[in-house]
């Protein structure tokens, strides 16, 4: 018998009670194969799954089966079967199914119209027949019932048990995929759902990107920082992993790998750009808290290799003063494995104008070092910070300091200044003595130092000739033949270093001649003392050319040149050589001064290495007579200097044109060499035969002057009259010589007996013999 299906009131809008009553009720659906149970989704526990949806659909079918059975028994009447309670139960089951579908499908559930009813969770899923899921899941996901069109015949009951299988009706290929009319009301709004069953949104996927970025190769050290401090801070602040390639491959830029989210990568790039901009001296960016929490402008300047010590100073004194004066913080960035011969970055942190001022101060220090004591300096050196810098040859620093600092202390006390030698890398030919104090006192101290250095380069003056100006200052620190007056310099070099000066095939000497404009050659003469361990070299040219030619030679022998001396002065006879030098051995350690010790030319204690600076002695009237006759002074000097038996007074030479015995020292043993007339004649002949160098000043011939000079001296001595003739016997200089050597012995810690040779005998005794 056919029973009309009651209308439950949740069909389409055109449905009426009469049509619902006339509708045939399908056969009852068998009970589900597994019992219904409450799931976690009913209590808001775990997230719903397709299995949960399957359970609720089974419950829905079971309740619908109950409704159909009651309607078939005739208990439903014309209204809804079971009254409002059953209708509410069925609607509740449908609502629960929709909620679970919305929970699983999220916002994918769509509202459909009446003409095309569909599940909210099925519109976006593909056909499951082609899926790769197991068969049981395919059936469970497809639904439990199929309903025919309204007004049609009731469908046959299903042949299989279990609500999850194929529902009764036509074959799968002919069946539509429409849900029951009660399920076509669309998805519930999310506001109507409980919080635990609200629409689910898939969590955003974490996107990680890797990007290659390039930075200047010279800025890699700044990016890494000391001990990796900088790069670690970049990674922590940006959340991006930063990896720098170990080598640039010779390219000006180095690759940097940035790994992280797009936002982190972008932030890391901004931080890298900011570091590079600061390293190039550009304006600071928004990331400026890089240097140990120091805010402000950060600028990096590169300090050339070997000059970092100038900026740091002794014990960090210079860099501390720079920081205090400029009000900034300075940090040297140096890796422990970094080569010491590469430039080092100096990081300056502070206010913009203070950083700029500090940079200028550092560059001033570097420029002063590059000038090396020359540049735009005045007579005594360039003025820096209210003082004066005086360049001192490196081999003469010990002379300025003196033994145990006696000389430099005396200069400081006399001038009222403070003198300090600047620290350097030790490669330059000079060292800078910085004088601090009032300007006029600094100039006075600089004048003393320059006079001291000049006295090292020049020997003490000889005695004045009678009626003529004083003789020229003897050059050099060793005994030997005097060179011509200007345009030439003779010096000795150890034999084992001559090859370094000459070079292979004479290439070094040729290069000096071409580049310096002077003419350098080796002399065939033996050294003055006949020592085979030394060779004589001659440099000819202008004074400037000679000075330029000396520099490469001193570099080759790693020491200063010791000139034998220039020619005699235009007035009187030249003074003898000063103390011996390191390459000019003499017969004894300390050479006598340029003349006997009358008050006009007091003895000065310039030693081999550390001199004793003495002020001029006061005027002594008792020695005035000794200064009246220069011939007597020369006689006493040469009798002691050459340690020879007393001979005739130098004012009575054997020949009128022969000068007194002065030139060559005796060959060992120093006896039996009393007549050097022929040697002097040969010397002056050579001078007259030497060709003039192009551009050199013309050499004067003093032969006739010397002849005339000694003729006058001989005539005065023979007649016993004339100015300057001694009224009686010649004065005795033994006491003066003894005092001179006592001073030297006291300075060098020697006993008076070991200071040197014995003083010469009295002139009276010499005349008596």
From Swiss-Prot:
Annotated disulfide bonds: none
The species this protein was found in: Gallus gallus
Cell location: Nucleus; Cytoplasm
Region (Disordered): 1-48, 108-209, 456-490, 558-628, 644-769
Biased composition (Basic and acidic residues): 126-138
Entries under CDD domains matching the protein: KH-I_FUBP2_rpt1, KH-I_FUBP2_rpt2, KH-I_FUBP2_rpt3, KH-I_FUBP2_rpt4
Comp. bias regions, Pro residues: 196-205, 563-585, 645-671
Residue ranges of every copy of the KH domain listed in the record: 208-272, 296-362, 385-449, 486-553
One Pfam family this sequence matches: FUBP_C
Lineage: Eukaryota, Metazoa, Chordata, Craniata, Vertebrata
Keywords associated with the record: Cytoplasm, mRNA transport, Nucleus, Repeat, RNA-binding, Transport
Biased composition (Low complexity): 152-163, 743-756
InterPro entries xref list: FUBP_C, KH-I_FUBP2_rpt1, KH-I_FUBP2_rpt2, KH-I_FUBP2_rpt3, KH-I_FUBP2_rpt4, KH_dom, KH_dom_type_1, KH_dom_type_1_sf
SUPFAM superfamilies found in the cross-reference section: Eukaryotic type KH-domain (KH-domain type I)
Family assignment from sequence similarity: Belongs to the KHSRP family.
One GO process term, biological-process aspect: cellular response to cytokine stimulus
GO molecular function: mRNA 3'-UTR AU-rich region binding; mRNA 3'-UTR binding; mRNA binding
Name this protein carries in UniProt: Far upstream element-binding protein 2
């Amino acid at each position: 018998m056919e029973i009309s299906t009651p209308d439950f009131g949740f069909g389409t809008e055109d449905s009426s009670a009469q049509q619902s009553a006339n509708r045939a009720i399908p056969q009852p659906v068998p009970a589900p194969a597994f019992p219904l149970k409450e799931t976690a989704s009913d209590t808001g526990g775990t997230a719903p799954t397709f299995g949960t949806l399957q359970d609720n659909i089974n419950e829905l079918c079971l309740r619908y089966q109950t409704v159909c059975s009651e309607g078939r028994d005739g208990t439903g009447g014309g209204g809804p079967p079971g009254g409002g309670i059953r209708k509410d139960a069925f609607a509740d089951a449908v609502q629960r199914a929709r909620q679970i579908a919305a929970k699983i499908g999220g916002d994918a559930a769509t509202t459909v119209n009446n003409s095309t009813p569909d599940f909210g969770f099925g519109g976006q899923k593909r056909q499951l027949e082609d899926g790769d899921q197991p068969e049981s899941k395919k059936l469970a996901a497809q639904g439990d019932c199929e309903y025919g069109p309204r007004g049609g015949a009731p469908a046959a009951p299903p042949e299989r048990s279990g609500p999850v299988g194929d529902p009764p009706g036509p074959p799968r290929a002919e069946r539509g995929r429409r849900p029951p009319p009660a399920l076509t009301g669309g998805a519930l709004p999310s506001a109507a759902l409980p919080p635990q069953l609200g629409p689910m949104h898939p969590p955003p996927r974490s996107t990680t990107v890797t990007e290659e970025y390039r930075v200047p190769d010279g800025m890699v050290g700044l990016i890494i920082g000391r001990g990796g401090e900088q790069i670690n801070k970049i990674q922590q602040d940006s959340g991006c992993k930063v990896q720098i390639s170990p080598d640039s491959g010779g390219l000006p830029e180095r690759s940097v790998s940035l790994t992280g989210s797009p936002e982190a990568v972008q932030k890391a790039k901004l931080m890298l750009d900011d570091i590079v901009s600061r390293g190039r001296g550009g304006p600071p960016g928004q990331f400026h808290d890089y240097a140990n929490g120091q805010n402000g402008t950060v600028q990096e300047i590169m300090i050339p290799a070997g000059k970092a010590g100038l900026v740091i100073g002794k014990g960090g004194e210079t860099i501390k003063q720079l920081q205090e004066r400029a009000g900034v913080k300075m940090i040297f960035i140096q890796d422990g494995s970094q080569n010491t011969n590469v430039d080092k970055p100096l990081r300056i942190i502070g206010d913009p104008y203070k950083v700029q001022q500090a940079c200028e101060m550092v560059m001033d220090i570097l420029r002063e070092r590059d000038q090396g004591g020359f540049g735009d300096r005045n007579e005594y050196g360039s003025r820096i910070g209210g003082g004066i810098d005086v360049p001192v040859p490196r081999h003469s620093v010990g002379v300025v300091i003196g033994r145990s600092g006696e000389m430099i202390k005396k200069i400081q006390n006399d001038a009222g200044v403070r003198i300090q030698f600047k620290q350097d890398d030790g490669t330059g030919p000079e060292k800078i003595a910085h004088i601090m104090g009032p300007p006029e006192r600094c100039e006075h101290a600089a004048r003393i130092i320059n006079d001291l250095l000049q006295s090292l380069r020049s020997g003490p003056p000889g005695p004045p000739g009678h009626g003529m100006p004083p003789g020229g200052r003897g050059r050099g620190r060793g005994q030997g033949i005097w060179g011509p007056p200007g345009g030439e310099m003779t010096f000795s070099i150890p034999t084992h270093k001559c090859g370094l000066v000459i070079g292979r095939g004479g290439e070094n000497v040729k290069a000096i001649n071409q580049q310096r404009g002077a003419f350098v050659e080796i002399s065939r003469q033996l050294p003055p003392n006949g020592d085979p361990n030394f060779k004589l070299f001659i440099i000819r040219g202008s004074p400037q050319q000679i000075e330029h030619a000396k520099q490469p030679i001193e570099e080759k022998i790693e020491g200063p040149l010791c000139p034998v001396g220039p020619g005699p002065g235009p007035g009187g006879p030249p003074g003898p050589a000063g103390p011996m030098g390191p390459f000019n051995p003499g017969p004894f350690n300390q050479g006598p001064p340029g003349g006997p010790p009358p008050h006009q030319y007091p003895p000065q204690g310039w030693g081999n290495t550390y001199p004793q600076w003495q002020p001029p002695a006061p005027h002594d009237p008792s020695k005035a007579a000794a200064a009246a006759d220069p011939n007597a002074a020369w006689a006493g000097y040469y009798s002691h200097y050459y340690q020879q038996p007393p001979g005739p007074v130098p004012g009575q030479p054997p020949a009128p044109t022969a000068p007194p015995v002065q030139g060559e020292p005796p060959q060992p043993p120093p006896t039996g060499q009393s007549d050097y007339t022929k040697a002097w004649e040969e010397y002056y002949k050579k001078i007259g035969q030497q060709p003039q160098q192009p551009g050199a000043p013309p050499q004067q011939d003093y032969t006739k002057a010397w002849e005339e000079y000694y003729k006058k001296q001989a005539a005065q001595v023979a007649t016993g009259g004339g100015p300057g003739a001694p009224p009686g016997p010649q004065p005795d200089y033994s006491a003066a010589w003894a005092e001179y050597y006592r001073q030297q012995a006291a300075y060098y810690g020697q006993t008076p007996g070991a200071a040197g040779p014995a003083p010469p005998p009295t002139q009276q005794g010499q005349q008596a013999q």
